[in-house]
Amino acid sequence: MDLKKTVNLLDTPFPMRGDLARREPGWLAQWQAQQRYQKLRKIAAGRPKFILHDGPPYANGDIHIGHAVNKILKDIIVRSKTQAGFDAPYVPGWDCHGLPIEHQIEKLVKGDKKAIEAAPSIHARITEYRKANGLDAKATDLPASFIRELCREYAGLQVERQKKDFIRLGVLGEWDNPYRTMSFRSEADEIRALGKLYQQGYLFKGLKPVYWCFDCGSALAEAEVEYQDKTSPTIDVAFASAEPEKLAAAFGLSALPAGKTASAVIWTTTPWTIPANQALNVHPDFDYGLYDTEKGLLILAADLAKGALERFGLTGVEVARCKGQALDRLTFRHPFYDRVSPVYVGDYVTLDAGTGIVHSAPAYGLEDFDSCRKNGMPNDAILNPVTSDGTYVDSLPFFGGLHIWKANPLIVEKLAEVGALMHTSPLSHSYPHCWRHKTPVVYRATTQWFVGMDREVAGSTLRQRALKGVDDTAFFPAWGQARLHAMIANRPDWCVSRQRNWGVPIPFFLDKQTGEPHPRTPELLEAVARKVEEQGINAWFELDPAELLGEDAARFDKMKDTLDVWFDSGTTHFHVLRGTHAEQLAYPADLYLEGSDQHRGWFHSSLLTGCALDGRAPYNQLLTHGFVVDGQGRKMSKSVGNVIAPQKINDSLGADILRLWVASTDYSGELAISDTILKGTTDSYRRLRNTIRFLLANLSDFNPATDALPVSELTELDRYALVLAQRLHAGVAEDCYPRYAFHTAMQAIVGYCTDDLGAFWLDIIKDRLYTTKADSKARRSAQTALWHVTRSLLSLLAPVLCFTADEAWQALTGEAEDSPVYHTWHELPVVADAEALAARWDVLRALRAQINKDIETLREAGAVGSSLQAEVDIEADAGLYPLLNALGDELKFVLIVSRVGVVPGPETRIRVSASGEQKCERCWHYHPTVGENAEAPTLCARCYDNIFGQGESRSYA
């Protein structure tokens, strides 16, 4: 007899090896052919909506691992919400305007080789244009309108390039119709949003210091500034008193000591601002001392005087002391220009470093500007000698025409020459840099357009509305709320104007006399918006003002400024959710999800525009994830050589491995990735796949429509397996997924597969699956539970392992185009006595774990090989005996041993020994009935009955 044919050893088309990198592209092609996203929209139509609004990545360059993390997290949420019973459309988007694209076009125009290799079609257009217009082959002075056309084309190419990589990750979405901030409709609606802000009174023009990048030649948003270490020259500079008598009186003296000059000493890290000094600041409540030194009388904050004098190499005796308030309005002479600087008191002066006296250049510092304006300095009196490219105006004495960074050492020399330099030394400190050019930026006063944070509109300010918006938003993780709250509470007015070409215009006509917008501005903005909606932003830049203004055109200038790109993305709730994609989406969004840097970026700008336009945040929830670092916690860097590209992972391991890594990592902090970490992820995947393969193989001859048993007819163990599956479902589908705790979900799923399934239930039921009659109730009981467990497990895994879950689902259902994402979470059958059942079997599992340890001791001693070679005798106490006795002979199947004896006793004792019986060739149990039947001398009686007789029945295991 061929015993192998009597055992139910089944196979499955679901292979052991995933071979994901090779097979995933084929599955993606099938999804596209099946129009999976569109089909899903039809299936989910009419359900409650869940809107995850995509924060647009910038359309420039290949996606990196951070992009992959972001898109995968979004996809997991969209899929899990869909399976939870929501209509969760996902419309991806791109941020398309702005300086990086302009710079790429500038490089192409100048013939940069790398830029040409990256965008040969754009280079070809430039070449054709030069030929067609009779220009020199290297001509760089091309019309702005043509440059904008090239920017639009370049952005379109980048969108397609990134889209391909995002789709490769398995992300389901409206890829055929994404939103792009450069679509004509979006550009027009941005102008309409601007018009609403203008009408409400939030928008104003003003002179203010704003972040300025000399390389960009433009103002920057706070989100476009990053901090890096920079070494600056620190200087202590003496400003001589212009009013000695008043100074003496301030210190309570009748006169200054005879023959002594007095100076206030300031400390700064920006020597280049000294030519623009217009005031000194002291704190009204600090003590200031007048110190007699070898270099005359010096005014210093009393708490900093000792350190300052040591720094200067001087000794000093305190002559007098006064509060800072007493020095208010006294004047001091500029070190090398013939003018005086008044003292203004200010609460922002600190004793953290320096001298306690701050030099004030109102054109180059926010606090300096506010202090001087508060004390009556008019805008036209503010000195602003630094031009947009970082050079001083030619008319500035001593330093005209020099770049400020080159002028720094020369200014220090000049101060030394005139005897005003008390000390200088280098200081390494954190300093703002342009995020694009990585070069230092400055504050520079320019006339710009601002959204006012503290202008009262309809009874409240934008700051108040935004702070309430933060309070009304749920944050994941929770610490994000305090962070965004602090940013809003302390931020200045929002500078929304930029001096660039490739951006949505601020289409104002300004009166040549007053500089004020045309009285019909709201009406004109709508007229411009309609033109832009038809022709794009070039419609404004090429517009003849007379077309809209008629004879008035001569009295007005057409603005050339463009909007901050953060206004582009910050108004997507207006021009996407309620604009280009209003039919698919809804407002407000349920969730915005981006990296933690977006508290000062997209979350921030969206909050401000939402609260200005609608009085509320445009989102109900905010989720932030950390940045990706290497295995040692270092930032990804080409120079360090630790960059791991998502494309490489997809091509070598498969996107499901990348998705599993993302889902298994706590994204609330930094996400570490390395080859070693990915190997661990691959091992976890392999264990999951092997579990799925076992489940599918043992269901390959099971038809749930004809073979499934009612829950009440299942064995106790199989009902317990359903309880365990229900526990997992409750933890994952009803808790982890709704609160976006994916790493906790994956820990639970992997733990379930390892402990509840592999090490327990599946281990026990193998005997029943393999050795009982194929259509026996005992086997069908196991298969009924297996079917529910498999559907539930695949359903829970599907948001993460979208490719693998699909492959397994189709193997389970036999339907080539089916997918878990088309179905809501699998509804597990109710187990009537679940609580009591679970309590009993939890006790049995604990007992089994103890007995396994004892068997392992025997195995290590060489007494037994497998656990089936062991016999167990249990003396059970009064609490345990009824439970074990009820199982009778089936207890041996639970313990996977050949015999179990149970007797009552005062306390529980366990004895494990090697069996002395013969081994059944078919079931591998050691049993005294082996050899009893001459027809099958190698079989036990149980196996003989399962082959030739009625077959065994099971109630418990």
Curated annotation (Swiss-Prot):
Binding site for ATP: K638
Motif ('HIGH' region): 57-67
Motif ('KMSKS' region): 635-639
Keyword Transferase among record annotations: no
Designated name of the protein: Isoleucine--tRNA ligase
Annotated cofactor note: Binds 1 zinc ion per subunit.
Protein's organism: Laribacter hongkongensis (strain HLHK9)
Function per UniProt: Catalyzes the attachment of isoleucine to tRNA(Ile). As IleRS can inadvertently accommodate and process structurally similar amino acids such as valine, to avoid such errors it has two additional distinct tRNA(Ile)-dependent editing activities. One activity is designated as 'pretransfer' editing and involves the hydrolysis of activated Val-AMP. The other activity is designated 'posttransfer' editing and involves deacylation of mischarged Val-tRNA(Ile).
Cofactor(s) this protein requires: Zn(2+)
Bilayer-crossing regions: none
Subunit composition and interactions: Monomer.
